[in-house]
Amino acid sequence: MGKVKYVLLDCDNTLCQSEHLAFEACADLTNELMAEKNIEQRYSAASLLEDFVGYNFRGMLNGLKQKHGFELSDAEMERYVSQELDRVTTKLSDKAVECPNVTTQLEWIKSQGYPMSVVSTSAKSRVVASLEKCNLDRFFKPEHVYSAATSLNPPSSKPDPKIYNYACEQLGVKNADAITVEDSKSGATAAMRAGIPCIAYVGIYGIEDSAEKMDQMGKLLTEQCKCVAVMKDWNEFPDILKKIESS
């Protein structure tokens, strides 16, 4: 594809180990919603992750509505979204850590002159909380942190490609001239639909689950989402980028 003109990066479980922390907070709030709607099922962080990894809370609520057959008024939706953001941001500000070797590779990307941007499905304040806690915010201009939940009107959520299309438009780069890194099916699907070559970062599954899950996700993201490479550790990034540019 020639020289990459922009490196786009997902945040949750790609740059920062934040997804499980966020889902711990989400599970408590989701169970409050289930009780309010007189639905017996209760969720753990693990069971929510299984069904909704890569979704923001608004997207998760829409999925729960469909799955359990209840309604939420606009006011209820906004109340729950606001509560979730407050709880998750507090937790991430306290406990988020970077994925292994991210700082080293962001330093390398910067040293090679590649511009970088974060393109997340999560609310911007939540993303910034994770980046700041991990000391990664120094790599990104504030205006180059994009959120499907808060940068778009109306809000969206991956796998909808709108946030990728919006980010590329704002950055002045053609979709096909950028690359991105994603860990989830929803994120990689958004990249695929936007026509942006995507590297599947599966190292997080080895950390949080197992080597078997890591291999399984690499296969899924390659076959179903057309990811151009699988990355098990961030230290593999320079070689992967070189192969992409020479392809």
Give the predicted meaning of each segment:
Residues G2-C11, L15-T103, E107-Q112:
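N-terminal helical cap/lid subdomain that shapes the substrate entry/recognition surface
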Residues L21, Y55-N56, V97-N101, S122, ...:
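Short beta->alpha linker loops
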Residues M116-V119, L136:
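Hydrophobic, well-structured mid-protein blocks that either form specific transmembrane helices
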Residues L15, M116, T180-V181:
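Conserved SAM-binding loop
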Residues T14, S120-S122:
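Conserved phosphate-coupling serine/threonine residues in phosphotransfer and NTP-handling enzymes
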